[in-house]
Amino acid sequence: EIVLRKRAVPTVGATLDALMHAGSADASIEMGQRAVRTYPYAFHVYHRTAMEWLRWEREEEIDSLWAQCVDRLPGEHLPRLYRALHEISRGNLQEGFQLREATMSIFGWLRRTTVQPPATFPEWKGESLTGKSIVIWSEFGLGDEIFFLRFARLLRERCGAAYVTVVCQSPLVKLFEESREADAVIDVKNAAQLPAHDYWVFPHTIPAYVPLELEALPPAVPFLRASPVKAPAVLLSAPRGVLKVGVVFKGAPTHENDRARSLPSLSVLDELFKLKGVEFFSLQKGAGADEAAQYAQRLSNFHDLGACIASMEETASAVAELDLVLTVDTSVSHVAGAMGKPTWVLLPSYGDWRWHYRREDSPWYPTARLFRRRFGGDWPEVVARIRGHLLVLSNEKQLAVAA
């Protein structure tokens, strides 16, 4: 009898496959609930169920799902982290960031930064900053640090901080200095030279203590500015009247979600390159740079700036000369968005929290437009949508020049 019962229990793979092919929201909810009842201690079952329910826009049920996962797996951090990210993605910023901080604080600084934060003055936990000095400490990737630079101004203007220092990774130092958002910018490699402050704080901690409404964020953009570094000549000499579009199609392959966020090949965008009146300028570095260089040799309207760009400030100078930046979710999307440049971001079905759920705009970057890969869809459908909008922009620019 025990053997027969065991045979009647579907495998995890069969359970999740059935969930993926649910034909309606109600069927998906029923199958998901059955899946977590059958495998109540398997985190990946909760995770897959949450993704499938998101397809059907059932965020309320996802709330309960992650709460159940936390209860079932009290000793694991991933349920708490994903519950926090879900809240942030929904727009519940303070609640989500508080949950996130409670989770990340378990691990200490090693999971967040490369250099230990100061031990000689305290971490900020929401105390009054009126007349105080504070350090925003380097955390996670370049895109994260660019995104959170906006909070230097927030700590001064809303919280009353008298002096704000930003400690960041080496590639960002000159770019951040040019922005003048912080009173001082220090390379994290030189953190030992940091003078005493009243407090230090990780960037992700700030919204846990400073209430923010997603639809009423403090004006911040632009908070990056192009440096005096001259943009590449091929960009400056582009014919008058053409639409100049920057392109980034891959992120760093070491990123945990890179398989979903990066395009498999530049060829995915081939339909765009056939448009007349549009010149494309690759800002690609690292992975994908060789492919971009090959395209530049084959197409007269595709130019590879990768070899001309050696720093983030040079990237910003190039972005300043473009009409539009078309990019996957990389640090360049944050550079362009923070500069107030029209930025079109290609996103996977399940994107990073800062792009939130289902939005086509970004409260954080008012000039950004989001092109999401639809659930069960592929990149060519996204590119077809982009092509239509690019054609409109190209025609508008040509008419403006003719006038």
Question: What does each model-found stretch correspond to?
Answer:
Residues 1-6:
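Flexible helix-coil transition and linker loops at the boundaries of alpha-helical arrays
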Residues 10-403:
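Catalytic machinery of carbohydrate-active enzymes
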